[in-house]
Amino acid sequence: MKIAVSGAGSWGTTLAVLLANKGHEVLLWAHRPEFAAALESDRENIRYLKGVRFPENLHVVSSLRDAVISSEMVVTAVPSQALRETVAMFSDCSLDGKIIVNVSKGIELKSGKRMSEVLLEVLPTLHASQVATLSGPSHAEEVSKGQPTTVVASSVSMGTAEIVQEAFHTGMFRVYVNTDIIGVELAGAVKNIIAIAAGITEGVGFGDNAKAAIITRGLAEMSRLCIRLGADPHTVSGLSGIGDLVVTCLSRHSRNRYVGEQIGAGRSLDDIVSQMNMVAEGVLTSKAVFELSRSVGVEMPITQAVYEMLFEHKPVQEAILDLMNREPKKEHY
C-alpha cells in the first residue's frame, strides 16, 4: 500500500518508519521544504527522532497535495490545533477510496470539535466511513525502538478500522479495533490534561497517593464527558482510555506530565513552552475541553483546575486546596 504521512515530528516519523518497515511505500511530508530536504538527505530525523534510520521505501516530500493524490491512505500526524490548516492543503483533491487516519490527540480550541469532525468539515467529499483514529499508550521513543506496544484503530466503519489494523499491525505493534471513534478521540484528548495535573503533584512534592487520586478521578471526568457525548462506556477502560492515561501520567517521555511538573515547581507556562522542542497537546486542549464541558454540562474539576492554573494564573496551592475542599460527593455520579 502507498501511504502518505503528514507531519514529521517524532510520532509522524515513527509511524512512517514502522509502515515502511512493514513493506508499504511511504511518503513523509514535512511542513518546511528545507526540513524535508534535510530529512531526505540525512535519512533520519535528527531533530525529533535521532538515531532511527529511514528504510529505502520511505521518502520525504514537501508537497502534501501530491503525496495525498498518489496514496491510498493518509495519516495525519500534526498537532491538533494545526490539523485544520494542514488538511485544507488537499481539500480540493479527490478522496474516493482513500482512508484518512488521524493520530493527533486533542480537541480543536476554536470549534470544540474532535479531530475526525475537523477532517469531515474541511474535506467535504470525505465520508465518515473513510476516517479512522489510531490511539493508545504509544510513546514514539519506545515504538521507534521496536518495544512492545498496543493501540486501537477506531472508525464508524469496522471494515475501515480493520484495514488500518492490517496496515499498522506488526509483531511488536499490536492493533485492536473498535467502532467508538467518539470515545477514542475524547479519551485521547482528556488524558493529556490529567497528565498535566499528575505532573503538578510531582512538581510540588506530593507522593503517590495524590498522583493515584488524580489518575482515578481524572478517569471519572473522562468517563462523564465521553458518556455525555455518546461514547461507549467500555472505551474508557480500554487502551485509548485508562491505558493511555496511565502511561501519559507516569512516563518520563510524557511532555504533558513534564509541563505539569514544571508548573508545580513554580515556572511560568510561557517559559516552559518556549523551551520545549515539541508540542504538549494538553495545554491548549485543557482550555478546549474546559469550554466543551461547560457547554454540555459535565463537571470536570481537575480539568477546570488545570485550565485555571495555565490560563488564569491561579496559584498552584490555591487550586489544590480548592479541589480538596469541594463539597463531599458520592464516588460515582
From Swiss-Prot:
GO terms for biological process: carbohydrate metabolic process; glycerol-3-phosphate biosynthetic process; glycerol-3-phosphate catabolic process; glycerophospholipid metabolic process; phospholipid biosynthetic process. It is found in: Cytoplasm. Pathway: Membrane lipid metabolism; glycerophospholipid metabolism. It catalyses: sn-glycerol 3-phosphate + NAD(+) = dihydroxyacetone phosphate + NADH + H(+); sn-glycerol 3-phosphate + NADP(+) = dihydroxyacetone phosphate + NADPH + H(+). The keyword Lipid metabolism applies. It comes from the Bacteria. Sn-glycerol 3-phosphate binds at K105, G136, S138, K191, D244, S254, R255, N256. Transmembrane segments: none annotated. GO terms for molecular function: glycerol-3-phosphate dehydrogenase [NAD(P)+] activity; NAD binding. This is Glycerol-3-phosphate dehydrogenase [NAD(P)+]. The gene is gpsA.
